[in-house]
UniProtKB/Swiss-Prot annotation:
Protein name (record): Gamma-aminobutyric acid receptor alpha-like
Organism field: Drosophila melanogaster (Fruit fly)
Biased composition (Low complexity): 597-609
Gene3D superfamilies on file: Neurotransmitter-gated ion-channel ligand-binding domain (2.70.170.10), Neurotransmitter-gated ion-channel transmembrane domain (1.20.58.390)
Function: GABA, an inhibitory neurotransmitter, mediates neuronal inhibition by binding to the GABA receptor and opening an integral chloride channel. May combine with the ligand-gated ion channel subunit Lcch3 to form cation-selective GABA-gated ion channels.
Signal peptide: 1-58
InterPro entries: GABAA/Glycine_rcpt (IPR006028), Neur_chan_lig-bd (IPR006202), Neur_chan_lig-bd_sf (IPR036734), Neur_channel (IPR006201), Neuro-gated_channel_TM_sf (IPR036719), Neuro_actylchol_rec (IPR038050), Neurotrans-gated_channel_TM (IPR006029), Neurotransmitter_ion_chnl_CS (IPR018000)
GO biological process, one term: chloride transmembrane transport
SUPFAM superfamilies: Neurotransmitter-gated ion-channel transmembrane pore, Nicotinic receptor ligand binding domain-like
Parts of the chain on the Extracellular side: 97-393
Gene that encodes it: Grd
Listed transmembrane segments: 394-414, 424-441, 456-476, 651-671
Bias-annotated ranges (Polar residues): 586-596
Amino acid sequence: MCTMPATRDASGSGDASTDLIAARSLSSHQGQRSNLRIFKLLISCCLLMLCIYPNAWPWSIGPGSGPFSVSADSIKGRGDTHRLGEMGTSLSSSLPSSWLTQSNNHANISELLDNLLRGYDNSIRPDFGGPPATIEVDIMVRSMGPISEVDMTYSMDCYFRQSWVDKRLAFEGAQDTLALSVSMLARIWKPDTYFYNGKQSYLHTITTPNKFVRIYQNGRVLYSSRLTIKAGCPMNLADFPMDIQKCPLKFGSFGYTTSDVIYRWNKERPPVAIAEDMKLSQFDLVDCPAGNLTDIVYKAAAPRPQRRPFNNKDPPRPTSKVMTTFAGPAAKNQHVRGTGLKLDKGAFGTGRDATGGSGSTTGLSGTITLETNHPSEYSMLMVNFHLQRHMGNFLIQVYGPCCLLVVLSWVSFWLNREATADRVSLGITTVLTMTFLGLEARTDLPKVSYPTALDFFVFLSFGFIFATILQFAVVHYYTKYGSGECYFIIEELDSESGESETEPLTSDFRGSTESKIYEVIPLSMCAISMPPPPTRLGMLTSRNRRPRNRRHGLWSMKLLGLFDWRRRRKPPRADSDEDEDDEQTQLRANEAPTTSAAAAAAQAAAQAARISPPTGGRRRMSYYRREEMEARRKGKRTPQYNSVSKIDRASRIVFPLLFILINVFYWYGYLSRSSRILANTPDAST
């Protein structure tokens, strides 16, 4: 009973040991298989590297030769070396040839750039210690604007290309050029180009920095970038808006002198190219000449305080010694870089003080000595953009309205000289409108100290309008009667007049206690038309009229005769000594029967003869005096009126002719001047 379990245990332990041995053999066999797989993977990687870089391996794969020949024992009977070579050959043949060639080119370029930049110092210019490096520049202008007269600036978008030769970057290979990325740009030398008159210029960085570098086999480097340049443009607005502005662009090296770097325009391409689709809203780009300049800079030494003599109480006069000789016509921009000093050309080469040698100067604490033995010269390039302004906008907004206002002011010459209110209001309205128009025209201009061509035209128009008001003042000064109304003289009636005659006068004419009264009646009421010839019924009716109505009818006829004399200018009547009363004559004419045409004609002739004044001076005066005396005696109203002013008649011709003549001289002078400027456009270096 007790041994059986022991026997079973022994047999059980024997089975366990057998299983353990089998498990160990299985695990070792699996380990060998995994090692074999790893070894195969390494061999495959080596073959792949050999296919990718065949030139880097001096040996080739062949059956039973080469470093990749493996013995049969090492691969546990899985094949021989000939089979391994066939596997490598099949892998290399399965890859595309174009991909392999491109991979080889990339590898060659990377290796070439590494070799070129190995030991390259980008802080040293090309040919250091030898001749100066030549920088060739050309510009491609894509767009221009805005151009501001107030700030005197202009902006443009351009491709700024620079080219120079750096022999350290020369190479040999199948490719003629190498295009470098932006990251490689920081590893090579570049000129420190800056814009002399630049303001807020920047490089475009969307979507990536817009610049690239290209290297040629001979070591030439082409560096191109897209810039938006905002530069200053000193404008002369004397001919505005018929002006031609010259906006310069100056650039050069900031730190390298002419002994290190020289700037030149590219001879293979035009210095400044303009895009064909470029348009400006207010200007036309007529020309863009380019030239070379040399910027001569004089370095200023530090101020040295002067010692005061012990026995001299007066402080010494501070001086500034200037001894300089110009070196050719190219040396035009002479200044002290980094300071506010302005060199006096009159003191150059004379050895005298820059202050003129007389008088004392306050505000200087010492002397400033200019080191003129070795002035620094900087190479500089400049291009002038000649911009001709469009005049269409100003013709519509300024010139046209000014001319219309001047013509409108001439309407007062055709108004009556008595229409004071109308002529004055018209003149003041045109003056105020002209003032507003002149102020509005200068809103887009800087506050310059000199008048422009537009200001001259505005002043001219304002002067003509103001002269119109002065002309009316002179006309009004010589106006004898009225200021828009018709005046009549009324006197008290004689005491001998009857009540029937005084009653209508006092009721109609608003009599007063004064001996003479001036009553004002509008001109519209002074226009009285000729009544038709009286009929038989009318004559019968007129007999029954009251004396007041008859008197009003006689007054109307008399007033009509005075106005018709001015209009028709009929000859005077032959009998100037006729003293018959108008009322009696009219009554007789009304009472006489008009049965025949001869009687009617005789009556009309007599009436015309009575109302026509004489033309002679003496007869005219006697006629006026007689009419006035008759009016005073009978209480009638005598109208007083003025003739058309001779000044108005002359102004209708003189003012338009003078305005046209001045305009001809104005436009001819300014337009011909602009044409001469275009014809005699100087070079950019002047």
